[in-house]
Amino acid sequence: MKASEMKKGSIVEYNNGTYQIRDIQRSSPQGRGGNVRFRFVMYSVPGGSKLEASFDADEMLTAVELLRREASFSYKDGEAFVFLDEEDYTLYTLEAEAIGDNAGYISEGLSGCYVQLIDASPVALQLPQHVVLEVVDTPPELKGGTATKRPKPAKLITGIEVMVPEYITTGERILVNTTTGAFGGRAS
């Protein structure tokens, strides 16, 4: 698979190891004939040691096919997250290092997740595209302040902060994109 086709959460083989891509940065070419490069922040699976590597857009990487099991978040056990397989009720425990920055999107009752397994042991988590989270703190809307729409910060129930439109109030449930971390609208 080409480096340009990789997505956040993909599992690849690199330097005789297995890694999960956690962040992707694209650099545009400078001048004529320059190549687009991708910088990946990867973590070893299992283990969690960090590795940064850069690749040309057409450079080939070997994607690892993992067994994926649909699961829902059950509870937190210390720093570990426990997920329940929705088919056979198996519990999968993932350490905080395996979850990484995605921990801010995991709330009580979250479903539609996929636990990724190597040899029947959980190594990574794939979140749904959008999650519903409750706003626990945001400044009130300024009436008549300006005709332009200004975003404001909102603290969510999981502790992360996202920028939301002025009309969002404390206590509302909103959609958050798990790839970009951006506001995606009011939850119905």
From Swiss-Prot:
Q: What InterPro entries does the record point to?
A: Elong-fact-P_C (IPR015365), NA-bd_OB-fold (IPR012340), Rib_uL2_dom2 (IPR014722), Transl_elong_fac_P/YeiP (IPR020599), Transl_elong_KOW-like (IPR013185), Transl_elong_p-like_YeiP (IPR011897), Transl_elong_P/YeiP_cen (IPR001059), Transl_elong_P/YeiP_CS (IPR013852)
**One Gene Ontology term, aspect cellular component:** cytoplasm
Any one Gene Ontology BP term = peptide biosynthetic process
Report the HAMAP family cross-referenced here.
EFP
Q: Which Gene3D superfamilies match?
A: 2.30.30.30, Nucleic acid-binding proteins
Write the protein's name.
Elongation factor P-like protein
Give an example GO molecular function.
translation elongation factor activity
> Which interval of the chain is the signal sequence?
none
Lineage of source species: Bacteria, Pseudomonadati, Pseudomonadota, Gammaproteobacteria, Lysobacterales
